[in-house]
Amino acid sequence: MNSLPPSTSAVSSPVSSVDSPLSAVSSSIGSPGVPGTPSIGYGPISNSQINSSMSVSRLHAVSSSDDVKPPFGLKSVSGSGPMLSQKRMCAICGDRSSGKHYGVYSCEGCKGFFKRTVRKDLSYTCRDNKECLVDKRQRNRCQYCRYQKCLAMGMKREAVQEERQKNKERDGDYECSSSANEEMPVEKILEAETAVEHRTDLHSDATGSPNDPVTNICQAADKQLFTLVEWAKRVPHFSDVPLDDQVILLRAGWNELLIAAFSHRSISVKDEILLATGLHVPKESTHNLGVEAFFDRESSHSAEVGALFDRVLTELVCKMRDMQMDKTELGCLRAIVLFNPDAKGLTSSSEVELLREKVYASLESYCKQKYPDQQGRFAKLLLRLPALRSIGLKCLEHLFFFKLIGNTPIDTFLMEMLESPH
């Protein structure tokens, strides 16, 4: 694959030399590249995707119904150590604790992992010698050792069972909705949307030329890519996915995620797209882009870009406006796009699929509670996903989001952002 030419400012020359936008997302960390026409669906996938080539003789089975002793080399945490400092850390992986869960200060990821393990009575295997490191970065690498560490640190199986019994005693409908929201809280999804929105507002400006939509879009894309990573890190359980898979998921869905965001932002204006920079791109300007000057290709691109802009307005912006889609629903749709179990190269496809199913359940529960008179609202929301997918592929072919941050490949940039704190 040809490398991009030396970078110039997106402001002065947003498209000075253009390869396929997919070249910007080619792997620089050894991850599989993104195919030209990736297959990303929104339905369930088959468990046959999860294959194992491990030797049976190297696997050590353990059932969650057994209280397993700490493995060799696993050190306990002193009660006077940093785990009980003012900023409590997860006793399992060292991430930030969200409180005491099942008897131990732990993060949401380890809490959810332990609860799922106990409730479903899952059995795990270790590929190595039962001494795998369990920390923030590698907690998903070995479920066997992670579960052992949960027990070693003092998590109580009976606490999970008591919690489940209490839930069963509640009203059936409430229990169902409460359980779904507990697994994937829509409040946290909304917080992710609003946190990024506020950050965008702080850094937005209107100094660009409203007569140069290509430059404006490139400027906005640069800002949105920064905020996209921050948004993803705030989505519940995304940080629980292995880091390499986080990069794969963002690389597979970044175009659809950004399109969904600016489409929803544009429902307050008519026949325009409202960019993250605060600038408006009117419909008329996209039909007179003269993009052949930018792309050095056939002039037919100009008409195609104008038609693509019309699709964004009619299939996304107008539909969102007509149904008055709120930010919680937008956040859930974007989370569904993010948790894509069909993304090529994933090592945790089944876990990602489970997270997507939890978003589905939480969104459906939210629609029933918030809009009880609109029985078809949940289905109507999901119908926006195929249109978003189709438009996203077209955008990759034509106009959006190339040369976003100079010569830095997107994979490397995403890796740096994901490793940085909030």
UniProtKB/Swiss-Prot annotation:
Gene name as annotated: rxrbb
InterPro entries xref list: NHR-like_dom_sf, Nuc_recep-AF1, Nucl_hrmn_rcpt_lig-bd, Nuclear_hormone_rcpt_NR2, Nuclear_hrmn_rcpt, Retinoid-X_rcpt/HNF4, Znf_hrmn_rcpt, Znf_NHR/GATA
SUPFAM superfamilies in the cross-refs: Glucocorticoid receptor-like (DNA-binding domain), Nuclear receptor ligand-binding domain
Family note: Belongs to the nuclear hormone receptor family. NR2 subfamily.
Domain notes: Composed of three domains: a modulating N-terminal domain, a DNA-binding domain and a C-terminal ligand-binding domain.
Function as written in the Swiss-Prot or TrEMBL entry: Receptor for retinoic acid. Retinoic acid receptors bind as heterodimers to their target response elements in response to their ligands, all-trans or 9-cis retinoic acid, and regulate gene expression in various biological processes. The rar/rxr heterodimers bind to the retinoic acid response elements (RARE) composed of tandem 5'-AGGTCA-3' sites known as DR1-DR5. The high affinity ligand for rxrs is 9-cis retinoic acid.
A molecular function GO annotation: nuclear steroid receptor activity
Assembly mode: Homodimer. Heterodimer; with a rar molecule. Binds DNA preferentially as a rar/rxr heterodimer. Heterodimerizes with rarga.
Basic and acidic residues composition-biased segments: 161-173
Source species, domain of life: Eukaryota
DNA-binding region of this protein: 90-155
Region (Disordered): 161-182
One GO process term, biological-process aspect: cell differentiation
Zinc finger (NR C4-type): 90-110, 126-150
Keyword terms: DNA-binding, Metal-binding, Nucleus, Receptor, Repressor, Transcription, Transcription regulation, Zinc, Zinc-finger
GO cellular component terms listed in the entry, alphabetical order: RNA polymerase II transcription regulator complex
Pfam families: Hormone_recep, Nuc_recep-AF1, zf-C4
Modulating: region residues: 1-89
Compartments it resides in: Nucleus
Official protein name in the record: Retinoic acid receptor RXR-beta-B
Domain NR LBD: 181-421
Segments for region (Hinge): 156-178
